[in-house]
């Protein structure tokens, strides 16, 4: 279903291999080895401008957050169409003033996902051919011919075959002229390096998120917590997958090159962002106030949970007070539940009113756009009709 994704990746690898092997005369194995790094350079070079826009847009979006909050406060309690329209226009003008594109952060992800899927498809298809390594069925992969795929299968780096992986059956390793120990001694340092640079990348991303996280948003806080867990687990993926799964030496090399490049690119872009777009004092004060409010909410939540657990424990230790403690827990829970429900109901009511007003505004915009299209078509049609002219005789009479 995703076979079309292998074409751009295989095309890039083919061009690098042709340049290195046919153009510069490098050994076939060395050419394939360097082609993996060439693939990283090509993909990252294409994505880099979009990644920069994403970082810049993210920083500027954070910078204007106090101004957006001020606009929201200005229109608090006003849900009529005129107010919503005016508020939307102010948001739009603010984004335009700071040159912010709300969709800038989507492009790198939209590019990287198909590239990554295509990459692993190509490398796995090349390293694990149909029919097995002993009797591979000649076949082309994307833009790579069957002969090029076969030359890749015969490629070696430091005498370790590119298709070999740690969990490969012993007979296949013997067929490739290597052993599990040789493969492990080569790829283990690679997976460790990949894990280390993954940790560095996640640490930089975590630091950026800590600087600009929107503590007033439950969605943002939830994503930040999930990212913290991911930052802990992500460095383990190269080690676990590399040592237990069918991940060939070629993918280990790609992981190292990709993570090293990503770390360097992220560090450089972060430095430029900090130098050219430092966080303003207005944002720092707003962010500190948001964080203090969030921490106070979390402190109250922990105090509530701790008190409830303590009361439950005391019910066991002091049975004669069980009814009293149970009633206390029930009252605490009821008050907290009612407060949360009231807050949610208020937010829901406001959101419902705003959605209704925004729906009407969008319908009006669609109707205006439809009328403009009709007027444009009518104008094009009238311009296309030739006006009738009275015939005149040659004498001019």
Swiss-Prot record:
Swiss-Prot/TrEMBL GO biological process terms: protein insertion into membrane; protein transport
GO cellular component: plasma membrane
Subcellular location: Cell membrane
Signal sequence, renumbered to the chain: none
Membrane topology value: Multi-pass membrane protein
Compositional bias annotation for Basic and acidic residues: 332-352, 358-370
Entry keywords, A to Z: Cell membrane, Chaperone, Membrane, Protein transport, Transmembrane, Transmembrane helix, Transport
Region listing for Disordered, in residue ranges: 327-397
Transmembrane segments: 30-50, 107-127, 183-203, 227-247, 253-273
Record has Protein transport as a keyword: yes
Top-rank lineage group of the source organism: Bacteria
MF annotations from Gene Ontology: membrane insertase activity
Ribosomal protein listed as a keyword: no
Subunit structure: Interacts with the Sec translocase complex via SecD. Specifically interacts with transmembrane segments of nascent integral membrane proteins during membrane integration.
Role played: Required for the insertion and/or proper folding and/or complex formation of integral membrane proteins into the membrane. Involved in integration of membrane proteins that insert both dependently and independently of the Sec translocase complex, as well as at least some lipoproteins. Aids folding of multispanning membrane proteins.
Family to which the UniProt record says this protein belongs: Belongs to the OXA1/ALB3/YidC family. Type 1 subfamily.
Name by which UniProt lists this protein: Membrane protein insertase YidC
């Amino acid at each position: 279903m995703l076979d079309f994704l292998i074409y751009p990746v295989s095309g890039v690898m083919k061009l690098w291999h042709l340049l290195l092997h046919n153009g510069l005369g490098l050994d076939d194995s060395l050419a394939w080895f360097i082609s993996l790094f060439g693939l990283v350079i090509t993909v990252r070079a294409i994505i880099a401008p979009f990644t920069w826009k994403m970082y810049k847009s993210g920083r500027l979006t954070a910078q204007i957050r106090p101004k957006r909050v001020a606009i929201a406060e200005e229109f608090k309690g006003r849900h009529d169409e005129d107010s919503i329209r005016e508020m939307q226009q102010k948001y739009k003008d603010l984004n335009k003033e700071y040159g912010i594109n709300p969709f800038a952060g989507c492009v790198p992800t939209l590019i990287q996902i198909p590239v990554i899927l295509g990459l692993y498809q190509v490398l796995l298809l090349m390293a694990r051919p149909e029919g097995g390594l002993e009797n591979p069925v000649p076949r082309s992969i994307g833009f790579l011919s069957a002969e090029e795929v076969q030359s890749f299968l015969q490629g070696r780096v430091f005498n370790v075959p590119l298709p070999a992986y740690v969990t490969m059956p012993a007979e296949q390793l013997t067929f490739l002229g290597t052993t599990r120990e040789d493969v492990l001694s080569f790829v283990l340092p690679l997976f460790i390096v990949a894990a280390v640079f993954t940790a560095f990348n996640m640490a930089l991303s975590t630091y950026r998120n800590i600087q600009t996280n929107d503590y007033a948003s439950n969605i943002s806080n939830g994503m930040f917590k999930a990212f913290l867990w991911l930052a802990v687990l992500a460095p383990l993926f190269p080690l676990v997958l590399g040592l237990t799964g069918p991940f060939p030496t070629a993918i280990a090399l790609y992981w190292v090159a990709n993570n090293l490049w990503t770390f360097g690119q992220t560090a450089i872009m972060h430095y430029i962002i900090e130098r050219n777009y430092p966080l303003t004092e207005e944002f720092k004060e707003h962010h500190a106030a948001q964080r203090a409010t969030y921490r106070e909410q979390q402190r109250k939540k922990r105090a509530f949970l701790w008190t409830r657990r303590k009361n439950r424990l005391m019910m066991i230790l002091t049975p004669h007070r069980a009814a009293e403690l149970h009633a206390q827990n029930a009252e605490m829970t009821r008050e907290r539940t009612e407060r949360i429900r009231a807050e949610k109901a208020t937010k829901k009511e406001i959101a419902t009113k705003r959605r209704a007003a925004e729906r009407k505004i969008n319908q009006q915009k669609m109707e205006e756009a439809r009328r403009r299209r009709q007027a444009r078509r009518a104008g094009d049609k009238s311009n296309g009709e030739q006006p009738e002219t009275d015939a005149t005789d040659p004498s001019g009479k």
